[in-house]
Amino acid sequence: MKLFVGLGNPGAKYAGNRHNIGFMALDQIASDHGFSPWKSKFQAQMSEGTLSGEKVILLKPQTFMNNSGQSVGEALRFFKLTPADVVVFHDELDLAPSKCRVKNGGGHAGHNGLRSIHAHIGADYGRVRLGVGHPGHKDAVAGYVLRDFPKADQGWLDDLMRGLSDGAAALATGDSGRFMNAVALRVAPPRSSTGEASKGRKKAQKSEPGVAKTPAKAATPEAPAAGDIPAAPEDSRSPMQKLLDKFK
């Protein structure tokens, strides 16, 4: 059994915040993989399902971020799990938006949700770090993570959520490499080799050294047909006038 924990703050006010990206990830997994309806348990919203034959509990603590460990500790003890069975999805300031990294154990890096989990179950649990970027100064962090993702971020955010869901089964079986591949295929899909080769060929044709372009020949105007040559105007002078004109 695995316990997937998504970090965030409860309530509609916070639903679209950067700090709630962990909740968003679990919502996507639950929706895509037919998990049970969410119910209240362990001071959290909980859903159950199966991924690649592995039973998985999804947990969204409703204690607010700074007390997330209370909920995680309760669930861990109830299901008789170890910290190694836990994977926490959380926002990561030190990763650029759309980036994702898997980590096992280590410090909390000042993240209050992780700090609380450390206090209740120790540090030996897995994390899926979801990049949201950094505002540039530590004094701006609180306001930054408690603001909604802007509309401009919705494209990569949707791709990231789908990638996390695609790879969830691999994560449940401990295959972090396959999980990361699934995420990468959504966030940075491979380009068409045919399209790239075609572009390359066109570029080469445009700039191939040593090949002089032959200028196009100017079109030679066609000679008019015999019937098209205008006839000389008729001479209307009298014979006497013609004779006089010769001596002018």
From Swiss-Prot:
The keyword Ribosomal protein is assigned to this record: no
Entry function: Hydrolyzes ribosome-free peptidyl-tRNAs (with 1 or more amino acids incorporated), which drop off the ribosome during protein synthesis, or as a result of ribosome stalling. Catalyzes the release of premature peptidyl moieties from peptidyl-tRNA molecules trapped in stalled 50S ribosomal subunits, and thus maintains levels of free tRNAs and 50S ribosomes.
Protein name: Peptidyl-tRNA hydrolase
Catalytic activity: an N-acyl-L-alpha-aminoacyl-tRNA + H2O = an N-acyl-L-amino acid + a tRNA + H(+)
GO molecular function, one term: tRNA binding
This protein's encoding gene: pth
Residues annotated as binding tRNA: Y14, F64, N66, N112
Main location: cytoplasm
